[in-house]
Amino acid sequence: ADASLTIKKNHSISLMPTIDFLMKSVNLSPQDLDRIVVAEGPGSYTGLRVAVATAKTLAYTLTIDLVGVSSLAALALNSHHEGLIVPIMDARRNHVYVGFYENGRAAKADQYASLNAVLEQLKGRKQVTFVGEVTAFRQEINQTFPEAKVLEVLPSAFKIGQVGQKLTPVDVHAFVPKY
């Protein structure tokens, strides 16, 4: 089951009822779960805190695995384009959280950098697709990479869940979000 909510506030109010709705929709109980997968960030401070606290609580109380997935990886894996996929999340003050993905794998570690530094790292690349929170950066991206695809997309909880099925679980107590 999959549900998508795009809300700016009150994650703490809507998250558990949404989980409950999804579980009931597919006739599952919490005891049927064997793993909790959560976006580990980067992202909204409050949104990440709510999601991670909920995920840790569920994993701990149900004594099941917990897995964290990069929000940038989720953005990249939503894209089905050839070449380098560059997911971007606005970090304010002309800085971004950025990843570099090719063939479904991270080509570099996720970074926090100025947009100019990111564009400089990519010089010489022919086939680049920028995904994520790109609207504020579209003009600068198009000036440097006029042939690039630039797609405004959000991370998909479904994709995060898919990716998380393949990853190694983490210690529930040690897990912290990546802001």
Placement of each model-derived feature along the sequence:
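Acyltransferase
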Residues: 149-179
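Surface "functional belts" at beta-alpha junctions
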Residues: 10, 65-155
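N-terminal beta-alpha supersecondary unit
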Residues: 1-40, 112
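Glycine-rich phosphate-binding loop signature in dinucleotide/nucleotide-binding domains
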Residues: 26-31, 122-126, 168
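DPxDG-like acidic metal-binding loop motif
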Residues: 35-66
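Phosphate-handling active-site elements
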Residues: 25-31, 60-69
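Residues at secondary-structure transition points
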Residues: 6-17, 45-49, 53, 70, ...
